[in-house]
């Protein structure tokens, strides 16, 4: 059985959604950032960078959310084509999320929600760049139902971030193709199950406190 080390974050949800979509059995280990469980010697042996998510499959550890998605797709032969061009298209959009949407929206989250000082220049910079990336997604989705044509790990990687656009103060208004994509993916039963792993705290203030504490870690 796959061991999943995770938390209720967009990156964590990528992997739980993929596991649910693939129907793979897994055991959840929900790590507490408040308790610095992602920095324990035991977890650092799984991910030397001390970040979630990570998995252990039959003694083999995989860290970095994109690498985990590729591993699961290749393990099962699903959610990514086997031909070179189809695989490349999935990986292009996966890397677009990993190198663009995730980092930019992550910084928008930090400066809009968590940073102790209000740095309007930083807020504007990251919100505007995140919106620009959303517009790229919208243009792509005007010509394809999903990012790589068929539903794939590229969509699974991107959806958990875009769905929380409000948290970063970024609008999807006017992006009708992106909105359609969000709605379609959000209706998938496996996606709905994956978003509950692990359960997100109901108290918004506790989320903010936890995130603020991580700024110095």
Regions found by a protein language model. Name each.
Residues 1-131, 138, 143, 211-212:
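GST-like domain detector, emphasizing the conserved glutathione-binding G-site
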Residues 32, 153, 198-201:
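Short, solvent-exposed turn/loop segments enriched in Gly/Ser/Thr/Pro and often Arg
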Residues 36-37, 73, 183, 202-204:
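Short secondary-structure boundary/hinge segments and terminal tails
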Residues 55, 68, 137, 155, ...:
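Residue-level signal for nonpolar/aromatic packing positions in well-ordered secondary structure
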Residues 89-92, 180, 193:
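Short, solvent-exposed alpha-helical surface patches in well-structured domains
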Residues 100, 105-109, 146-174, 179-187, ...:
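GST superfamily/GST-like fold recognition
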Residues 198-217:
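Acidic/histidine-enriched, glycine/proline-rich intrinsically disordered or flexible terminal extensions
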